[in-house]
């Protein structure tokens, strides 16, 4: 007679579709900071994140709203367009290089990896700012 359940418990963030733990573990094994790019409905966010036992530590954070405040981006323009994503990535890359980081690994989360899209536009900005991130040239957007 069988006892117990055959169900396998699924982690909450995986069940909600927020985290791919297999991909996250691969990124963490590299022991390099992660250049996290997230595109929401209103803006682009770029962060430089390092792993810690108590939780991830964000060392640099730049969002599309920072373009308005610090860099004079026109208020009526989109904060999630390809050009805005490039500028957010460039600002994050400059801040990361200024803080002493020289390398990172791109973390796009569960976003679709569309070549030439907003995520890779932010990647191009980070690379142009001097941050060394492994990538293929075919995914970057055109000039």
Residue ranges and their predicted role:
Residues 1-56, 60-61, 65-71, 137, ...:
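Intrinsically disordered, Lys/Arg-rich N-terminal extensions and targeting peptides
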Residues 73-97:
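Acidic helix/loop or adjacent segment enriched in Glu/Asp that either coordinates divalent metal
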Residues 96-103, 114:
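Beta-rich strand-turn-strand
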Residues 43-49, 105-114:
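Histidine-centered divalent-metal-coordination microenvironment in nucleic-acid enzymes
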Residues 73-78, 104-110:
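Short, flexible active-site loops
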């Amino acid at each position: 007679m069988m006892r117990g359940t055959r169900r396998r418990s699924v982690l909450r963030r995986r069940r909600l579709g927020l985290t791919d733990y297999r991909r996250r573990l691969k990124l963490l094994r590299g022991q390099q900071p992660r250049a996290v790019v997230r595109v929401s409905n209103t803006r682009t966010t770029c962060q430089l994140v390092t792993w810690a036992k108590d939780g991830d530590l964000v060392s640099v954070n730049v969002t599309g709203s920072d373009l308005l405040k610090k860099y004079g981006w026109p208020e009526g323009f989109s904060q999630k367009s390809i050009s805005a994503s490039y500028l957010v990535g460039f600002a994050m890359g400059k801040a990361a290089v200024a803080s002493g980081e020289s390398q990172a690994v791109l973390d796009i989360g569960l976003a679709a990896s569309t070549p030439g899209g907003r995520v890779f536009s932010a990647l191009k900005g980070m690379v142009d700012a001097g941050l060394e991130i492994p990538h293929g040239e075919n995914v970057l957007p055109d000039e």
